[in-house]
């Protein structure tokens, strides 16, 4: 069975002329809209938000501790008062006129403040942490299974009660 096919070359000028005409019409409308926007902005005063001056904040080296980076950022935000590192009694002090840069380490008394609470010191910290996370994961999995089981039982009991 043969189907009549219209030649592409015969129909192309008709299709192209209408699409080119639409494109030209669109471009004219776009140009008119741009001109009217220019006229509107020229007649009304331009309102711009005030731009704050850029702050001189430098990124700390990735090897510096987090506390030093935080103190440097705070010091850059408040250049009049430099924030010093916390003393062993955990109180931070503001120093006026201190040189900028990372905080200096305070002398530590023997055995005072050298260990963190709840975190064992030594090379086995990572292994202990992984074991703790594994136990936590197992506990959460058990709770999820019990919760799903109770939900299934509750659903079954509700169906039985509805059926009578």
Swiss-Prot record:
Keywords: Nodulation, Plasmid. Disulfide bonds: none annotated. Induction: By flavonoid signal compounds. Residues 37-57 are annotated as: Disordered. InterPro entries: Nodulation_NolB. Coiled coil: none annotated. It holds the Pfam family NolB. Regulates cultivar-specific nodulation of soybean. This is Nodulation protein NolB. It comes from Rhizobium fredii (Sinorhizobium fredii). The lineage of its organism: Bacteria, Pseudomonadati, Pseudomonadota, Alphaproteobacteria, Hyphomicrobiales.
